[in-house]
């Protein structure tokens, strides 16, 4: 009698396992849910459509690819807000902020790029936001921007938060001008005849010529 009951229970358990059923006492937290990932994606897509942040996906089969004429463009980028990501639009999109060393960067006060001088045109003064009595030449512009890399407003002028063109111009006028080099030091000394440029015309001496 007991053996018959044991065999009946074992056969029932084997039938459950063969059918893919799991008894309640054998439930493990590692067992995946019966809801498929596709069902979850469809649910999330429906919620995002209700919120207005998901657009229906339009796909073109391979045989219709040649029917697309005219310029094609792709929208979306680093700073374009929420985007339609993933086949169901369910991939979370976070608008990233450009930072340096985890510190938000204020691009209005950026000192990373040189600021060219702004000489005053005829009839304008310094009150109009330009520099008076400055030479409007390319050489002065190069010198002006070169000094910006050496100019430290935080230490030289503690009250300033960004470049001050007027103070920089005053500093340039008071300092010693850099001497221009008119002689290239790399062209001095004895020339190496065995070193030739790649595009130079090959030179053959008379000794290398074949006797006629």
UniProtKB/Swiss-Prot annotation:
Could you tell me one molecular function GO term of this UniProt entry? enzyme regulator activity
Annotated protein name in UniProt: Neuroendocrine protein 7B2
Annotated region (Disordered), positions in chain: 174-212
Q: Which family does it belong to?
A: Belongs to the 7B2 family.
Q: What does the function comment of this entry state? A: Acts as a molecular chaperone for PCSK2/PC2, preventing its premature activation in the regulated secretory pathway. Binds to inactive PCSK2 in the endoplasmic reticulum and facilitates its transport from there to later compartments of the secretory pathway where it is proteolytically matured and activated. Also required for cleavage of PCSK2 but does not appear to be involved in its folding. Plays a role in regulating pituitary hormone secretion. The C-terminal peptide inhibits PCSK2 in vitro.
Its GO CC terms are: extracellular region; nucleus; secretory granule
Q: Which residues carry this modification: Phosphoserine?
A: 141, 205
List the cysteine pairs that form cystine: 120-130
Q: Which organism is it from?
A: Homo sapiens (Human)
Record keywords:
Chaperone, Cleavage on pair of basic residues, Disulfide bond, Neuropeptide, Phosphoprotein, Secreted, Signal, Sulfation, Transport
Repeat among keywords: no
Q: Which PANTHER family match?
A: NEUROENDOCRINE PROTEIN 7B2 (PTHR12738:SF0)
Under InterPro entries, the record lists:
Secretogranin_V
